[in-house]
Regions:
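Conserved NTP phosphate-binding and transfer environment spanning the P-loop NTPase/kinase superfamily
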Residues: 277, 399-544
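Post-Walker A helix-loop "phosphate-sensing" segment adjacent to the P-loop in P-loop NTPases
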Residues: 301-311
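Glycine-rich phosphate-binding loop used to anchor ATP phosphates in small-molecule kinases
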Residues: 347-405, 455-469
Length: 544
């Protein structure tokens, strides 16, 4: 269709006569995601996106952040807003306020009610959200005057000549990604008191007419808070802080501290297992590219230090024959399904081992799609313990016939705690996707394009089989490190650049490249061979 030169995507959509129940909120323009403010000056291919798309819900969420920050500064002009971690199907927000003596003022339910009312009013008034472009120097000076030093640090290292920012009724802010065009398009949100802060709840992507279901994640929140305490000590909350440390030659020190923290955490878990009499099996689960395998190997070393001999068991060897494997909605074999495993055999053999009996372990022949006997016999001695890694390891149905007191469960994931700036968080899934892109290319010959294409299917399986059971863990281990993105950047960028503009996956590759652009690189030569990152980068002293 022909449209006037310079018209916005919003105007283009109006001319199409199309309707979208939950949109449009953004669009793919030549396979790059743009906001509805974007102007068309020449021929383009356009695909409008609604709230049921990943890019659409991101734009909606960022706009909610903007409205929340504006409302908070209207009520408490000197406050400091920190958009923090994704938790409990929402986002944790910390609003720092101080009294005249400099003491922190705790957030109360009444404060949150006032903030909610202010946000609701701002949305109901349907204020336009203006998008502006300024030189980066001008943007830096603007945010410096506003006291937004995390944005100043971020933009100082952006390397960009111009910077886009947004204005809402005189309140200016920068966001990594597009926003909606008016506040009135925010049809639904929730705001609740949560651990001395605020939980901002957003619509469900599957059903945008409803808020995402609240899920208690007390153990997950505790892990995030533990890492935040270390970040405060290291003064390393944002990418701007990380870049400054790299620039001043502190990268090696940061690597050493981060690696030591991880090793200390693994050692503490091993010590706890050793002190729990009766534990005969350690189960380790986590989503894709969470570093489960290296976590398992490093834990085995620490168990050995405690006089325990770990015996590895692979859940892959307990697959059912191919003709008994469940199928998904498309009729394909669903190897991620819990019932693709021979659960009765697993429980029978584990209990036999715990009774001191000898068993012959199965081995799965992937070429034939058949379970076979391996000829390998196993009998547990008094100082031996089974270590089992797999996506279903925390699902209680997997070990339903094994007494709980004989099992210790560990959940491993890459929980990114560093922020781009105080109003722009880094999705934990981005960290894992970048790890997987590097690993798939290095060890499996799979392109970044193909990894990105498969990623939604991987995430779907995680949402069904892993995340619902993470709070069942006796211990949680965060495999992400503060410096990590600065190291994997060097290997990830050339792979992402090979995802060309003429394919659908370019939008995600471009988004990741844009985000990595803000981070200064660290040479991987400084990473020790026992590091969990070596599972993805290569050069590990562990055998995989």
């Amino acid at each position: 269709m022909n449209v006037p030169v310079g018209c916005t995507l919003e105007e283009v959509f109006q001319q199409t006569g199309l309707t979208m129940e939950y949109g449009p909120v953004s669009a793919k323009v030549n396979n790059k995601v743009e906001g509805m403010h974007y102007r068309i000056y020449k021929q383009k291919t356009i695909e409008f996106l609604d709230l049921q798309s990943a890019s659409g819900i991101r734009a909606y969420t960022r706009t909610l952040f903007f409205v929340l920050c504006k409302a908070a500064h209207d009520i408490w002009p000197k406050c400091r807003v920190m958009i923090d971690i994704p938790i409990s199907n929402g986002y944790y927000v910390d609003i720092e306020r101080k009294d005249e003596q400099g003491n922190k003022i705790e957030m109360t339910p009444d404060d949150i009610a006032e903030l909610r009312e202010r946000m609701t009013t701002t949305i109901a008034e349907n204020h336009p959200i203006h998008r502006f472009e300024a030189t980066t120097e001008e943007a830096i000076e603007m945010f410096r005057k506003a006291g937004s030093m995390s944005k100043v640090k971020l933009l100082e290292n952006s390397g960009r000549l111009f910077t886009t920012y947004y204005d809402l009724d005189g309140y200016k802010d920068y966001y990594y990604g597009n926003l909606l065009t008016t506040t009135g398009k925010l049809h639904l949100f929730g705001l609740e008191y949560y651990y001395n802060g605020i939980l901002l709840r957003i619509p469900s992507r599957e059903n945008p007419a409803k808020l995402g279901a609240f899920i208690r994640q007390d153990k997950m929140f505790e892990i995030f808070q533990e890492h935040h305490q270390w970040q405060e000590i290291l003064k390393m909350r944002t990418v701007g802080d990380l870049n400054a440390a790299i620039e001043h030659g502190y990268a090696n020190n940061l690597i050493q501290i981060s690696e030591a923290l991880q090793e200390k955490k693994i050692a503490q878990i091993a010590d706890e297992i050793a002190h729990l009499k009766g534990v005969r099996m350690v189960l380790i689960a986590g989503p894709s590219s969470s570093g489960k395998t290296t976590t398992c190997k490093r834990l085995s070393v620490q168990l050995a230090v405690n006089g325990i001999r770990p015996i590895g068991i692979s859940l892959d060897d307990y697959f059912l024959d191919r003709d008994q494997t469940p199928r998904d909605e498309d009729g394909d074999f669903d190897f991620e399904h819990l019932h693709a495993l021979n659960i009765p055999l697993l429980n029978e053999q584990m209990n036999a081992l715990f009774r001191g009996e000898e068993v012959e372990l199965p081995r799965y022949n992937f070429q034939k799609g058949k379970s076979e006997w391996s000829g390998k016999k196993l009998k547990l001695n008094g100082n031996e313990i089974l270590v089992v890694e797999g996506i279903h390891a925390l699902n209680p149905e997997l070990t339903a016939q094994i007494p709980d007191e004989q099992i210790y469960r560990i959940y491993a994931s890459a929980l990114t705690t560093i922020l781009l700036d105080s109003h722009n968080y880094i999705p934990t899934t981005d960290n894992r996707l970048l790890r997987r892109i590097i690993r798939d290319h290095k060890y499996r010959g799979v392109s970044a394009k193909e990894t990105i294409r498969r990623w939604p299917s991987v995430r779907k399986g995680e949402n069904r089989w892993i995340f619902p059971f993470q709070e069942n863990a006796d211990a949680m281990f965060n495999s992400a490190m503060l410096f990590e993105l600065a190291v994997i950047k060097k290997q990830a960028e050339p792979l992402l650049e090979e995802v060309y503009e003429n394919c659908e996956e370019h939008a995600e590759a471009y988004r990741l490249l844009k985000f990595l652009h803000y981070i200064k690189p660290i040479s991987e030569d400084q990473i020790p061979p026992t590091s969990l990152l070596r599972e993805f980068l290569g050069g590990s002293s562990f055998e995989y």
